[in-house]
Amino acid sequence: MDTSGPAAFVNGEILKMFVGRRVRTVVQAQREEGGLLIGQSTDGHQLTIKGASGAPMSHYVEIIGIAEPNQAIRAEVCTDFGENFDPAPFNGLCKLANGQMKDLFL
């Protein structure tokens, strides 16, 4: 496992605490606007993903990239998780990884 550039697990609410840092999240693709992917985070926030165009609409997509202001992420890696993804466990993981269990995560 490469730990040289760890990515924090974030949902829409937690994303704003990591501006300028590498993050990992999952969004459900909703639409594309001018080369940007607009998606819904696992906790219901609307996120703008730069550099992730081409994702199938309604699919869940894992995004690893750099958090930017205004609920945006500059994508480095995008992985299509398909339509059958339960967002609740990932959202719970984000809360644990940034709350009471954060010492267990990079």
Swiss-Prot record:
<dbReference type="GO" id="GO:0031981">
    <property type="term" value="C:nuclear lumen"/>
</dbReference>
<keyword id="KW-0539">Nucleus</keyword>
<keyword id="KW-0233">DNA recombination</keyword>
<comment type="function">
    <text>As part of the replication protein A (RPA/RP-A), a single-stranded DNA-binding heterotrimeric complex, may play an essential role in DNA replication, recombination and repair. Binds and stabilizes single-stranded DNA intermediates, preventing complementary DNA reannealing and recruiting different proteins involved in DNA metabolism.</text>
</comment>
<dbReference type="GO" id="GO:0006281">
    <property type="term" value="P:DNA repair"/>
</dbReference>
<keyword id="KW-0235">DNA replication</keyword>
<comment type="similarity">
    <text>Belongs to the replication factor A protein 3 family.</text>
</comment>
<keyword id="KW-0238">DNA-binding</keyword>
<dbReference type="GO" id="GO:0003677">
    <property type="term" value="F:DNA binding"/>
</dbReference>
<dbReference type="GO" id="GO:0006310">
    <property type="term" value="P:DNA recombination"/>
</dbReference>
<dbReference type="InterPro" id="IPR012340">
    <property type="entry name" value="NA-bd_OB-fold"/>
</dbReference>
<keyword id="KW-0227">DNA damage</keyword>
<dbReference type="Pfam" id="PF08661">
    <property type="entry name" value="Rep_fac-A_3"/>
</dbReference>
<protein>
    <recommendedName>
        <fullName>Replication protein A 14 kDa subunit</fullName>
    </recommendedName>
</protein>
<dbReference type="InterPro" id="IPR013970">
    <property type="entry name" value="Rfa2"/>
</dbReference>
<keyword id="KW-0234">DNA repair</keyword>
<dbReference type="GO" id="GO:0006260">
    <property type="term" value="P:DNA replication"/>
</dbReference>
<comment type="subunit">
    <text>Component of the heterotrimeric canonical replication protein A complex (RPA). Interacts with RPA1B, RPA2A, RPA2B and RPA2C.</text>
</comment>
